[in-house]
Amino acid sequence: MANIFPPNTNKRFYGIAALVALAAAFVLGGIYYVNFSIPEYEPVQPVRFSHKLHAGDLKMSCTACHSAAQRSSRAGIPDTKSCLGCHQHILPDSPLIAPLREAADPQYPGYTGEPVRWVMVNRLSGHAYFNHMAHLNRGIGCTSCHGDVAGMERIRAPRDARMQWCLECHRNPAPHLRPLEETASSHYSAADYLRTHSIRDEEGKSIQTPLQLGNFLKRQWKIQPKTDCTACHH
């Protein structure tokens, strides 16, 4: 019986198969390295709030404003009344505070009652899930993900927020672990902490280095982060 396929059919088949395999590799690679945040995204906010001043110079803890991070999946943005809780006494007449008073101070001449519309900076893809409470309560500090907030005038999205970045921490969490009372500090240094705190491991040996401290906390809290898909994707 005569061959109904042209002589180069096999070559075409293998060529198409190779292209499909290459495309699949690019897709899977793209998923692995996908950016969850827009690189260097640093939007202008309706109120000129300086993280450098508050978290840096004044050394306020992150949870002083983002208290929801300790009890829910989202860190949240403080409501305007929380801001005025401080600023009704501190620089209340500053023009920088005016948008807050317009939104939440009925005694202010320019009061409108319109809420301040903050611009979201850190936005995960719809298929990814991150729980702030779970990380903070297991010794992961805010700066491990958000970077040097104490040095930022305007908050910006982390440059390396990729799946690979998350997996690297889940596979080796010890370098990122810190005592629970230090998770919301932008100034924490494990070396400085060990200079002022005497900590001994299970055998009574003195812990001397940051890595020893991280590994000790990992053992104490029995931390074994998941690395399968369902850990972050639901």
Where are the predicted features?
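N-terminal Lys/Arg-rich, disordered targeting/topogenic segments
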Residues: M1-T9
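Hydrophobic membrane-insertion alpha-helices, especially the h-region
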Residues: Y14-I31
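Aromatic-capped interface at the extracytoplasmic side
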Residues: F26-P43
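Sequence context surrounding c-type heme c attachment/ligation sites in exported
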Residues: P43-D93, N131-H234
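Structured, soluble extracytoplasmic/luminal domains of envelope-associated proteins
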Residues: K81-G126
